[in-house]
């Protein structure tokens, strides 16, 4: 059989445009702002996502169309942190979720309130975490006990922020954890607003475990 080498040229790299002489950063950002996340990822970033094999399917998310946030009964902030701010490092991610009841007869539902992802040095991550806590005032803050999550836990607890550490048990990898929550998505209990950050989270979920 023929041997093929796949070459990918995403329009934007971590340090800027792949071809800065032709496409400027601000021009690419304008293009990105006009496109759905799925189309931007496929056509410009060489990262198409497929529904086939996806554990969390796009159509399982319920789009929350109201412009105002529903009355929340509990706010949860979740952190998945990386080690270093370098191009080969994983991203650190902060997501904020709210528990609400769509009507009197329904059970608890979950809405994505905010999502931030980037590569941060620890002082940046600490400042960002404090800003996010002050803005959303979550009742529960969950930080995975790995990488920079451990010193971040220590710093936030010094400021009387109620951090709960999460340590996955052996055999309970990310694939298993996603499978465990998939029924919540499939049953229509997970909502997301019509905003860019939510589109990006939905696409990232749809790409798992292959993305």
Question: Over which residues does each language-model region extend?
Answer:
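Catalytic phosphate/metal-binding cores of nucleic-acid and nucleotide-processing enzymes, i.e., regions
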Residues: 72-74, 98-101, 150
């Amino acid at each position: 059989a023929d041997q093929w080498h796949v070459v990918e040229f995403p329009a934007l790299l971590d340090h800027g445009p792949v071809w800065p002489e032709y496409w400027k950063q601000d021009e690419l950002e304008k293009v990105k702002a006009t496109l759905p996340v799925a189309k931007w990822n496929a056509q410009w970033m060489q990262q198409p996502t497929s529904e086939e094999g996806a554990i969390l399917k796009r159509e399982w998310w319920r789009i929350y169309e109201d412009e105002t946030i529903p009355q929340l009964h509990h706010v949860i902030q979740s952190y998945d942190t990386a080690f270093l701010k370098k191009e080969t490092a994983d991203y650190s991610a902060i997501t904020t979720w709210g528990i609400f009841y769509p009507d009197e007869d329904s059970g608890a539902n979950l809405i994505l309130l905010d999502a931030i992802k980037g590569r941060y040095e620890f002082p940046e991550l600490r400042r960002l975490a404090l800003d996010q806590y002050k803005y959303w005032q979550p009742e529960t803050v969950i930080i995975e006990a790995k990488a920079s999550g451990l010193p971040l836990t220590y710093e936030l607890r010094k400021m009387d922020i109620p951090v709960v550490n999460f340590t996955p048990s052996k055999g309970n990898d990310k694939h298993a954890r996603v499978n465990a929550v998939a029924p919540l998505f499939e049953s229509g209990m997970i909502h997301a607003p019509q905003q860019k950050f939510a589109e990006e989270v939905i696409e990232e979920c749809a790409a798992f475990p292959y993305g």
